[in-house]
Amino acid sequence: MKFKLQDHMLVPKHEVLSKEEAEELLKILGIGKEQLPKIKADDPIAKEIGAKPGDIVKITRKSLTAGESVFYRLVV
């Protein structure tokens, strides 16, 4: 039986954006991919969700003040 990182209560939700979602995000933010914070392709959670270099990962964290916070990372 393999342990899934995303099943742990302290690990925020990670998901790979589709190509269309990624393009829309970059358009809304008015930036290029290279301007996003990075996450390595060999990061355990990136491996688990099947993220490949060049993908954009959406991270949704629970926040006591905001309720929910969304962050984006470029897989390198």
Swiss-Prot record:
Keyword Transferase found: yes
Alphabetized SUPFAM superfamilies for the sequence: RPB5-like RNA polymerase subunit
Source taxon at top rank: Archaea
One Gene Ontology MF term: DNA-directed RNA polymerase activity
Residues of the signal peptide: none
GO annotations of cellular component type: cytoplasm; DNA-directed RNA polymerase complex
Record's subcellular location: Cytoplasm
Biological process per Gene Ontology, one example term: transcription elongation by RNA polymerase I
Matching InterPro entries: Arch_Rpo5/euc_Rpb5, RNA_pol_subH/Rpb5_C, RNA_pol_subH/Rpb5_CS, RPB5-like_sf
Reactions accelerated catalytically: RNA(n) + a ribonucleoside 5'-triphosphate = RNA(n+1) + diphosphate
EC number: 2.7.7.6
Short name of one Pfam family: RNA_pol_Rpb5_C
Gene3D superfamilies xrefs: RPB5-like RNA polymerase subunit
Keyword Transferase belongs to the record: yes
Enzyme's top EC category: transferase
Alphabetical UniProt keywords: Cytoplasm, DNA-directed RNA polymerase, Nucleotidyltransferase, Transcription, Transferase
Binding partners and assembly: Part of the RNA polymerase complex.
Family, as annotated: Belongs to the archaeal Rpo5/eukaryotic RPB5 RNA polymerase subunit family.
Function: DNA-dependent RNA polymerase (RNAP) catalyzes the transcription of DNA into RNA using the four ribonucleoside triphosphates as substrates.
Name of the molecule in the record: DNA-directed RNA polymerase subunit Rpo5
